Amino acid sequence: ISMHAEKRFMAPINVEEFYPLDDSEQDGHKTHIVMSWLLGPTNDLHASLTAELLAGVLLEDSASPLQQALETCDLGTAPSPLCGLDNSNKEMTFVCGMEGSTPEDTQAVEDLIISTLQDVVKEGVPQESIEAVLHQLEMEQREIGGGSYPYGLELILDATTTAVHYGAALAALSLTPVLEQLRSDI
C-alpha cells in the first residue's frame, strides 16, 4: 500500500457539492459551509498532538473562540458536525463551518471563521484554557479503560494510522516526551 501526499494548491479552492433532500425538507436551510486546512503528516506524533491541542483550544466547548463564534452567529443552525481535526489519513486536516445555512451565506461564514482566527492570533487565548485542553488531551491519550475495546487493542488501533503510513508505530505510543514538550511549549 502506498499513500501519496495530498495535492497542494497555490490558492484556496471552492468546491460545491449537492445531496438529495426529501420533499418535506425543502426549507432552504440545508447547506453545509465548511472550510478546511491541510496540516502536517499524521505519523509525526508531536505535530499530531499539537494539532489536537490547537483544535481543542479553538473548538473544545462553547467558551472556545471558534466554537463560540459559530454557535452565536445567525448564519446557520449549528456548527457543522464535520468541525474538528481529522488525523486518520496520511495528512491531517482541520475543518470548521456551519450547517443549516444557505448558499448566500458562504462568504459571511468564511469571513466569520477567518476573522475569529485572526482575533485569536492577535489577542491570544487565556493560558488556563490552553492548559485545561492540554490536561484533557493528556488524560484522553493515557486513558486505560475508557474505550469500548480492551486496552491492548486500543493501543494497536492508536498506532495503526502511523504504521499504515510507514511511520514508527512504537514511537507513536511514546507519549510522555511529546506531552512534556507540549507542556513546555505552552
Language-model segments: residues:
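Non-catalytic beta-strand/loop surface segments
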Residues: I1-L45, G56-Q107, D111, P126-E154, ...
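Conserved short hydrophobic interaction patches
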Residues: L112, T116-V120
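C-terminal, helix-dominated tail/subdomain
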Residues: G145-V178
